[in-house]
């Protein structure tokens, strides 16, 4: 990686600074010349991936990964905080404080979901050379009001995005 801003194998393209719920992050985009550090997948052949609501991912060889369902875990707390926030004065300091608490809770939910997705996609990408994934109409599935929250909580689109870049 870059040390003291210099490395022959990497070129810094740009950096992005972002703020999420009182936390600051910096993200670097580098262009690497030498890709020797990348390891090939352990060749276990091909695998088919089936996405679901109860079992987040089921592989054709029998591996099953359960969905963490972070929104379901924190939904009551989120509802209570949002109800409490709706009762505060419009531009008051208590409303701003509650907004930060709600933002932190949303971040925690997203972090749990992303962590589980990264673990599953990393396992698949590092163990299988060829991955076949079903093509789902997630937008159409979200129109079913009975399943929409569960489908959004699992994160099918993010799973597909992570698996494609890994």
Feature-to-residue mapping (PLM):
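Positively charged, helix-rich recognition surfaces that bind polyanionic ligands
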Residues: 4-8, 14-166
């Amino acid at each position: 990686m870059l040390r003291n801003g210099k490395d022959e194998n990497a070129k810094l393209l740009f950096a992005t600074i972002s703020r999420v719920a009182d936390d600051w992050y910096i993200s670097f985009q580098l262009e690497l010349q030498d890709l020797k550090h990348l390891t090939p997948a352990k060749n276990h052949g091909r695998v088919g991936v089936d996405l679901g609501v109860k079992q987040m991912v089921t592989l054709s060889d029998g591996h099953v990964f359960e969905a963490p369902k972070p929104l379901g875990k924190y939904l009551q707390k989120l509802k209570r905080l949002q109800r409490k926030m709706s009762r505060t004065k419009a531009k008051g300091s208590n409303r701003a404080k509650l907004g930060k608490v709600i933002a932190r809770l949303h971040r925690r939910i997203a972090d749990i979901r992303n962590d589980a997705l990264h673990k599953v996609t990393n396992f698949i990408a590092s163990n299988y050379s060829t991955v076949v994934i079903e093509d789902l109409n997630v937008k159409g599935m979200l129109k079913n009001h009975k399943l929409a929250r569960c489908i959004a909580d699992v994160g099918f689109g993010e799973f597909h995005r992570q698996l494609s870049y890994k």
